[in-house]
Amino acid sequence: MRTTGIFAAVLFSLALFSPGPGRCDELGESYFPLKAGMRWEYTVTSNQGQPQKLIITNLAPREVNGVKVVPRKWELGGKIFIELMKQDDTGVYRYAEQQGEIAPPSLVTPMEYHLKFPIAQGNSWNMTTKLGNSVLTVGTTIESVSDEVKVPAGTFKDCLKIKQAGENAEGTSILGYEWYAPKVGVVKSMVTIKRKTKEGAASSEQRV
């Protein structure tokens, strides 16, 4: 749930429009496919602007500092962001990231888990993320392993429902939900972001 760079990572609402063509590692691969060539197209909506198209493509594996990772290219609003994903026996996480296709990668510390094993209802973990200049610790919980989700691409059953919530001392807070479908990945994501203004009032953003 990293919000630096051009995308706010998974912190916007999206609905799967057309997806591209079991154990811990098998379950991780099922809910977060990392096969090269897979492609996802989403419609991103926000109360801050017009709907946009987001395309995510898995590229061929490569090495960063001797670690094998899978680059996932995000294309949104004419800009490109690449997250370098790693899966091991602890889960699926963002190991590094890069702004654009030719920029050098930078390591993500601490690691940001998209999924952490075991994949089971009630499993939870924390991660640190940035929202603009604000740093938040976000609690992540698998609330369900059997949700049904309807989006423009169709109806998906047996989805993971993951809740993400965090707030810092500056009054910035996040409440988000993601749904992962077996063999597809994320099919829906939505988030509410609240910030305090200089006058002390709270402003909110709902992306659905």
What are these regions (language model features)?
Residues 19-23:
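Signal peptide processing junction and immediate N-terminal pro/mature segment
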Residues 24-208:
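Conserved functional acidic sites
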Residues 1-5:
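Positively charged n-region of N-terminal signal peptides that target proteins for export
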Residues 6-9, 191:
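Short helix-onset patch at the extreme N-terminus, typifying the N->h transition
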